[in-house]
Structures are given as C-alpha cells and as structure tokens.
Design a protein with these regions (language model features):
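N-terminal low-complexity, intrinsically disordered segments
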Residues: 24-28
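Long, contiguous secondary-structure blocks with strong helical propensity
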Residues: 2, 45, 82, 86, ...
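C-terminal "cap" of GNAT-fold acetyltransferases
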Residues: 112-124
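Conserved donor-binding loop and adjoining core beta-sheet/short helix segment
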Residues: 29-64, 121
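A structural boundary/capping signal
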Residues: 1-8, 36-38, 90, 95-99, ...
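Acyl-donor binding region in acyl/amide transferases
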Residues: 51-103, 110-112
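Short amphipathic alpha-helix that is part of the acyltransferase structural core
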Residues: 1-23
Length: 124
C-alpha cells in the first residue's frame, strides 16, 4: 500500500476523516518539518519538536505480525537517529505494550499534550 492509503485506512478504521490528517502531513513533509518512514503497511511520521526530541505518529493497515515487524524496523531507525527521546499519544494501549515488549523504555510523558515518552538509549 502507498502511505496515503495506509493513513486513510487507519483514519477510517478509527472513525476519523483522513483529509485533515493528509493535508497536515503533506504540509509538514513539504516544509521538511517531518520525515516519513514506511515498513510494510505501516507508516511512522517523525516530527522534531526540540533539540534531540521528536513527536511520533503511527498509522497502520498491518495485521499484528506485520505491525511487530514494522515496529522493530522503526525502533532500529530511531536508535540510529541520534534522538534522545520521542513522544506520542497512543490511542491503542496495545501498541505501547508491543513497543515495551520490543525492549523500548516507555514511560508517562513529562511534556503536556503527550501521554507517553520513550527515552534514549532505546534498549537493545
């Protein structure tokens, strides 16, 4: 699937209109304010929000096994990125549990507007 198809499928599955999401992401990507990673039928948007920190948004159309593979790849790329911490809002607590099971230190966020934080070093 193309990234726009993945994001659209994820938004619709969650009862959200995909148009505003796609418009905002297009602007962020065009302005080089964010990067997009894709693995299988999952997309991760990484938006720098400060020195050494970024905000993450995950969109997926993968089944559980495909999502685990994608998360492994995304974690590997984040480990090599030089980021100290990443933040996000998880609508699905199962995804946070998957990330923890893959060895990432995930804690409650210390920044307003986010409900989780993962810190460096992202454990091997």
């Amino acid at each position: 699937m193309k990234p726009t198809e993945i994001i659209t499928a994820d938004a619709k599955r969650n009862g959200v209109n995909p148009a505003p999401i796609l418009n905002k992401l297009g602007r962020l990507l065009n302005n080089k304010e964010a990067i997009m990673l894709q693995s299988g039928n999952s997309v991760l948007i990484v938006q720098k929000i400060g020195k050494g920190i970024a905000e993450l948004h995950l969109y997926t159309a993968d089944n559980q096994m495909g999502l685990v593979r994608a998360l492994r790849e995304f974690i590997k790329k984040i480990r090599s990125s030089g980021l100290d911490a990443v933040y996000g809002n998880a609508d699905n607590p199962q995804i946070i549990e998957m990330v923890k099971a893959l060895g990432v230190n995930v804690i409650d966020s210390d920044l307003p507007g986010y409900n989780w934080k993962a810190t460096y070093p992202f454990k091997e």
